[in-house]
Amino acid sequence: MAAPAVSGVSQQVRYFGTSVVRPFAKLVRPPVQVYGVEGRYATALYSAASKQKKLEQVEKELLRVAQILKEPKVAASVLNPYVKHSIKVKSLSDIIAKERFSPLTTNLINLLAENGRLSNTQGVVSAFSTMMSVHRGEVPCTVTTASPLEEATLSELKTVLKSFLSQGQILKLEVKTDPSIMGGMIVRIGEKYVDMSAKTKIQKLSKAMREVI
């Protein structure tokens, strides 16, 4: 019984992707594929927004939607599974009217509500943000250190990391601190992962010593 429901959702998502653009228009595929229910909704929205040249506008509106849904009062009325559907629809209608979202964003919200998928909204926003990040040529990079880096060291690190990027790519750097790594740093850039932490070095040394003994 579950398969037809999923199929129905997929059909509605595909319909959403073409309902606001001319019929039979070719689907614009996002620069990166995101799987799951959230990925299907985000892909349909990306295609529709791309055709209307409103990707940036929709991205801003989705971030606003995510922000609104985090508000306790809104979450209590919209995301609570025990609240009647009619009340959720009324709350969403009020929000849409107040924010004056574009038809693209409005259609997405209404479709999520209709399919009982409002709990997936944050995931859809995240998936769409990922697509937009790749669309802009951004390369995510996370650097974890035991203590905050000095400004000069951070500047030097950025220069080194940028040297690994291709032309047109943009470094999207996030620096975190985690005292448990004890020293050194852990770098994740794109699909690459390099662990130069003191903690890992100590673990490797400990393992090597045990093997010798």
UniProtKB/Swiss-Prot annotation:
Extent of motif SIFI-degron: 5-23
The protein's predominant localisation is mitochondrion
Q: Name one GO molecular function term.
A: proton-transporting ATP synthase activity, rotational mechanism
What residue stretch is labeled transit peptide in the record?
Answer: 1-23
**N6-succinyllysine is carried by which residues?**
K90, K158, K162, K199
Q: Which family does it belong to?
A: Belongs to the ATPase delta chain family.
- State the protein's name: ATP synthase peripheral stalk subunit OSCP, mitochondrial
From what organism does this protein derive? Callithrix jacchus (White-tufted-ear marmoset)
Gene that specifies this protein? ATP5PO
